[in-house]
Amino acid sequence: MTVGKSSKMLQHIDCRMRCILQDGRIFIGTFKAFDKHMNLILCDCDEFRKIKPKNSKQAEREEKRVLGLVLLRGENLVSMTVEGPPPKDTGIARVPLAGAAGGPGIGRAAGRGVPAGVPMPQAPAGLAGPIRGVGGPSQQVMTPQGRGTVAAAAAAATASIAGAPTQYPSGRGGPPPPMGRGAPPPGMMAPPPGMRPPMGPPMGMPPGRGAPMGMPPPGMRPPPPGMRGPPPPGMRPPRP
C-alpha cells in the first residue's frame, strides 16, 4: 500500500504504542511498521492481561509477560494510543563514522603464521619425519643411477688408476673377470690344470672361421720347407 508522507501513522513510527485487543489484552511496544490491513510490528513488546479472581472478595490482578518482537494482526486490534516518545538513540548509527574519535584500543592487523619468539612444538621421538627441504639425503644420492652409466664408469676408471680398490654397489654383481692370455673365450670350457691352453686366432682375424689356407691348425708344427701342407678343410688330398 502506498502511504503518503502526511499519513498520521508515519508520525508514530518508533514511538511506544499501547494497543488494546478484542479479548482485553494490552500490548505495549515500539511501533516499527504497518500495512493497509493494520497489521502492526512491535519490538520490545510487553503483554498485560487482567486475571479475574475465583472469589468475589479477591481483587482483580494484572499479569505481565515479556514477548519481544510481535506481529499483531489488525483484525484483533481495537485501539492504539501513544504511550511514550521515541527513544533518544533512534536514528544514531551503530557503526562508528570515519571522522569519529578513536577509543583507547589499538587497531592491529590479524597475525599470519607463527609469532616470533614462540617455541615450536616438538613431535615425540620416533614420530617426527623429515621436513621438506630440511635434512634428508643429498640430491646426488637420490638421483637414480642405472647400470653402466658414464659417471659410474668414469669413477671406477679413476679409482683403478689411482690404485684404490673399486667398490661396486651391492646387488648389481661383482667386477668382471680378468681377461688373461690363456683365458678361454665365452662358451668354451677351460683346459685341465697343467695343460697349455690352445692359441687363439691371429690378430685381425675374426674367431670361429678356421685357419687360413697353407697354415696348420693350432698346436701342430708347420711342414718343412719345400713340402706341401695339409689340404684345406673340405678338399680331398691329392693322389700319389
From Swiss-Prot:
Residues 163-240 are annotated as: Disordered. Gene3D superfamilies: 2.30.30.100. The modification Asymmetric dimethylarginine is found at residues 108, 112. CDD domains: Sm_B (cd01717). InterPro entries: LSM_dom_sf (IPR010920), Sm (IPR047575), Sm_dom_euk/arc (IPR001163), snRNP-assoc_SmB/SmN (IPR017131). It comes from the Eukaryota. Residues 175-236 are annotated as: Repeat-rich region. It is found in: Cytoplasm, Cytosol; Nucleus. The modification Omega-N-methylarginine is found at residues 108, 112, 147, 172. Sequence repeats lie at residues 175-181, 191-196, 216-221, 222-228, 230-236. The modification Dimethylated arginine is found at residues 108, 112. GO terms for biological process: mRNA splicing, via spliceosome; spliceosomal snRNP assembly. One of its GO terms (molecular function) is RNA binding. Residues 174-205, 214-240 have a biased composition (Pro residues). SUPFAM superfamilies: Sm-like ribonucleoproteins. GO terms for cellular component: catalytic step 2 spliceosome; cytoplasm; cytosol; methylosome; nucleus; SMN-Sm protein complex; U1 snRNP; U2 snRNP. Residues 4-86 form the Sm domain. Its main location: cytoplasm. Methylated by PRMT5. Arg-108 and Arg-112 are dimethylated, probably to asymmetric dimethylarginine. Plays a role in pre-mRNA splicing as a core component of the spliceosomal U1, U2, U4 and U5 small nuclear ribonucleoproteins (snRNPs), the building blocks of the spliceosome. Component of both the pre-catalytic spliceosome B complex and activated spliceosome C complexes. As a component of the minor spliceosome, involved in the splicing of U12-type introns in pre-mRNAs. As part of the U7 snRNP it is involved in histone pre-mRNA 3'-end processing. Belongs to the snRNP SmB/SmN family. Core component of the spliceosomal U1, U2, U4 and U5 small nuclear ribonucleoproteins (snRNPs), the building blocks of the spliceosome. Most spliceosomal snRNPs contain a common set of Sm proteins, SNRPB, SNRPD1, SNRPD2, SNRPD3, SNRPE, SNRPF and SNRPG that assemble in a heptameric protein ring on the Sm site of the small nuclear RNA to form the core snRNP. Component of the U1 snRNP. The U1 snRNP is composed of the U1 snRNA and the 7 core Sm proteins SNRPB, SNRPD1, SNRPD2, SNRPD3, SNRPE, SNRPF and SNRPG, and at least three U1 snRNP-specific proteins SNRNP70/U1-70K, SNRPA/U1-A and SNRPC/U1-C. This is Small nuclear ribonucleoprotein-associated protein B'. The gene is SNRPB.
